[in-house]
UniProtKB/Swiss-Prot annotation:
Species of origin: Rhinoceros unicornis (Greater Indian rhinoceros)
Location relative to the cell: Mitochondrion inner membrane
Gene3D superfamilies found in the cross-reference section: NADH-ubiquinone/plastoquinone oxidoreductase chain 6, subunit NuoJ (1.20.120.1200)
Protein name according to UniProt: NADH-ubiquinone oxidoreductase chain 6
InterPro entries in alphabetical order: ComplexI_Subunit6 (IPR050269), NADH_UbQ/plastoQ_OxRdtase_su6 (IPR001457), Nuo/plastoQ_OxRdtase_6_NuoJ (IPR042106)
Family label: Belongs to the complex I subunit 6 family.
Amino acid sequence: MMIYIGFILSIVFVISFVGFSSKPSPIYGGLVLIVSGGVGCGIVMSFGGSFLGLMVFLIYLGGMLVVFGYTTAMATEQYPEVWVSNATVLSTFILGVLMEAMLVLYMFKNGEVEVVFEFSGMGDWVVCDGGDSGVFNEEIVGVSALYSYGVWIIIVTGWSLFVGVLVVLEVTRGA
């Protein structure tokens, strides 16, 4: 059941980014990015990384909401463009949703969802060792995981925030 929840969240995640990439208006783009950020953190938390999901969501809300508030105030339109007001925007959105639907059908046809990454050094995460078995708690090792194994998450998050700022500036420049 948890795999299906993660799969549905990833579908909503991709569709929300398709909605943002069709960029009808900065107001709706900011809203869709906030929703996709929340869904992305839900994906991280559904795989057991509650501390990392919370950290990413706090970083995202702290950084991007300020940027979107400023750019939305600077690019206020009397009649903001929606996804169905332009044929090009609507066709881009429909094409992205159809590609996501084809991916979903392909995944259901094969009947398997594989995890992309594997932890090779699980011994580093063990908190209580009882001979042949070890128990680890995700909350206790969350901070150490963020700064040791999760360094790439911090780098990708920082780079994504930087690219997001550039995209928002590009979207609002033409308005």
